[in-house]
Structures are given as structure tokens and as C-alpha cells.
């Protein structure tokens, strides 16, 4: 898992441009996005517990927060966890299991995909797994 915050990290080559009309803040730069969707979660909602063989997924947090979990497929590594909040972008590469659990009411995020994801392609590159969320199996 890789992540950055659009308001505090400039290492991604992102820019912020301000004039009398307001501000434009880059979320991505030189990314080949094939799909984007807006997702709203209730408190405690769980999403994910899957991976994609060919798709890179970007999750951009608009409001609220959620715990983001990731681990490589067929790996003995421990699950990584990260508290994602407004402005954070989390990148899940192919063959990286990812899951999320909402911690605040009204968590809204946009999921972007490089690869098949929406319309007729929905779930064609999604492989479900048992929960990787820490504490779910205790």
C-alpha cells in the first residue's frame, strides 16, 4: 500500500494552483484512470476484502475517515493498516488484498481504477478473500 495526502504531500508531482477564482488541487498526475465512482459509507461499514489481478485502485477520501488494510496475495506478511482521512489517496496495486472499515459517519470517498471496474466490467477483475481486517477473527 502506498498513500499520500493531497494537502500535505508534494512528492507525487502534484500541484496546487490558486488565483482570484479559487483553488485547483491535483489529485493525480499522469495516471491512466479507466473508472471512477463515488462511495458513501455508514459507521462501521466494511468494504473490500478482495484484490484485483490487473487493476490498480486509488481511493481518495473526501470526508470522514476509515481504517485501510492491505496485504499481498499469497504472502505471510502481516496486514498493514492505515487511518485514512480527508485528502488521503491510497494506492492498491494488482495482487494486493485491500479492505476498509469506516470509523466516522458519512465517510465518502472516490474509488478510481486503472483497469476493468465499472459498467459491464464490474467485478470482472475482483477476487474475494476472507477478511484481512485486524481483529475480525478473534
Model regions and ranges:
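Conserved short histidine dyad/triad with adjacent acidic residue
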Residues: 37-55
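Glycine- and acidic-residue-biased ligand/ion/polar-headgroup-sensing regions
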Residues: 54-73
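A short, N-terminal "cap"/entry segment at the start of jelly-roll beta-barrel domains
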Residues: 1-34
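Double-stranded beta-helix
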Residues: 7-12, 99-138
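A generic "binding-loop/recognition-motif" signal
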Residues: 20, 54, 96-97, 105
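Short acidic-glycine-tyrosine-enriched beta hairpin
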Residues: 73-94
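Short beta-strand His + acidic residue motifs that chelate non-heme Fe in jelly-roll/DSBH
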Residues: 24, 49, 68-69, 92, ...
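His/acidic/aromatic-lined binding-pocket segments of jelly-roll/cupin-type domains
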Residues: 50, 56-61, 82, 89-90, ...
Amino acid at each position: 500500500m502506498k498513500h499520500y495526502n493531497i494537502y500535505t504531500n508534494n512528492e507525487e508531482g502534484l500541484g496546487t494552483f490558486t488565483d482570484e477564482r479559487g483553488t485547483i488541487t491535483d489529485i493525480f498526475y499522469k495516471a491512466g484512470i479507466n473508472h471512477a465512482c463515488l462511495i458513501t459509507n455508514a459507521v462501521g461499514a466494511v468494504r473490500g476484502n478482495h484484490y484485483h489481478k490487473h487493476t490498480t485502485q486509488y481511493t481518495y477520501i473526501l470526508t470522514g475517515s476509515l481504517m485501510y488494510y492491505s496485504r499481498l496475495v499469497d504472502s505471510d506478511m502481516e496486514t498493514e493498516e492505515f487511518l485514512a482521512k480527508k485528502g488521503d489517496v491510497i494506492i492498491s496495486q494488482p495482487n494486493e488484498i485491500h479492505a476498509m472499515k469506516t470509523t466516522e459517519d458519512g465517510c465518502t470517498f472516490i474509488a478510481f481504477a486503472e483497469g476493468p471496474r465499472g459498467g459491464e466490467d464490474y467485478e470482472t477483475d475482483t477476487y474475494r478473500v476472507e477478511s484481512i481486517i485486524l481483529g475480525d477473527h478473534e
